[in-house]
């Protein structure tokens, strides 16, 4: 029997892919969606009739959600299409203060607490119908409040526990302030991705004078 390698092992999708863009992440999700549509369109189409690959190739993977707000500033999450059995990825930037909403006639910038509350609203609106939910949070909510040094709240630990209790399967973040905060959810999946190489590569591309070996060594 021939040995199986990474080249000939096929992975069956968990479910139809769905991408949810939270406020402030629309442009990023558009780029991700366009890349996935193009990449999957170029894949072999031999499994198109296989029920396990249902929804593998689509025109878009974005899921239409809305977060209407009342005049009091209160909001609700609405999922405008079925996500039953989907493999959902929710992308949120909780530190994006360029997002605003109207409260009592005033434009108010969204705080990390507002972004986090919206995230929970969308998860609640999904109502447990998705096959798997993954949260992609580039900067971890309350990541700097990762330990207690006096009579303090453990906000990051509480947030992680809340998300897991709401049915989130995976939480992904970049360069967490202290990755040991994952101890708050020992049975949950917490991925701390280090973007060091990508940052150096981006700097070298954007600032050509940094490409010289001697210059890089002096950084």
What kind of feature is each model-predicted range?
Residues 1-214:
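PRPP-associated nucleotide enzymes
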């Amino acid at each position: 029997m021939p040995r199986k390698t990474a080249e000939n092992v096929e992975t069956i999708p968990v479910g139809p892919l769905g991408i949810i863009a939270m406020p402030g992440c629309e442009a990023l999700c558009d780029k991700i969606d366009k890349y996935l549509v193009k990449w999957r369109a170029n894949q072999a189409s031999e499994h198109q009739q296989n029920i396990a690959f249902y929804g593998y190739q689509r025109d878009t993977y974005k899921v239409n959600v809305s977060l209407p707000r009342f005049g009091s500033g209160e909001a609700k999450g609405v999922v405008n299409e079925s996500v039953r059995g989907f493999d959902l990825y929710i992308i949120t930037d909780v530190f994006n203060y360029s997002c605003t909403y109207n409260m009592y006639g005033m434009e108010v910038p969204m705080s990390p607490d507002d972004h986090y509350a919206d995230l929970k609203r969308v998860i609640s609106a999904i109502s447990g119908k998705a096959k798997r939910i993954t949260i992609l949070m580039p900067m971890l909510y309350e990541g700097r409040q990762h330990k207690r040094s006096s009579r303090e709240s453990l906000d990051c630990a509480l947030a992680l526990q809340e998300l897991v209790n709401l049915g989130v399967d995976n939480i992904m973040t970049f360069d967490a302030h202290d990755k040991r905060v994952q101890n708050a959810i020992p049975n949950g999946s917490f991925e701390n991705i280090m973007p060091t190489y990508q940052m150096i590569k981006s700097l070298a591309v954007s600032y050509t004078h940094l490409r010289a070996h001697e210059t890089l060594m002096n950084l």
